[in-house]
């Protein structure tokens, strides 16, 4: 009887691990957009934090270099926060009911 329960437990653990790996792949490929300056600068970033695209409104090309740099940094930071929130939300949904703390880093 115990062997059967252990086998079921192992199957369940393997299934959870497969689901987590799939979720991590989906998160890595998910893209978010961060912006600053009311949309004058937009950054597209994937779940690996790779910046895929930077859009700068032409009106900013007339501004001082420091303003442009500040807006770029703000847009990147906005995108990073959105990636992290997306990752946290997805993992919270995956681990709901398992008794795993929401910020627990999985080893796989």
From Swiss-Prot:
Belongs to the YbaB/EbfC family. It comes from the Bacteria. Its main location: cytoplasm. NCBIfam families: DNA_YbaB_EbfC. It holds the Pfam family YbaB_DNA_bd. Homodimer. Keywords: Cytoplasm, DNA-binding. It is found in: Cytoplasm, Nucleoid. One of its GO terms (cellular component) is cytosol. Binds to DNA and alters its conformation. May be involved in regulation of gene expression, nucleoid organization and DNA protection. This is Nucleoid-associated protein HCH_02614. GO terms for molecular function: DNA binding. The keyword Cytoplasm applies.
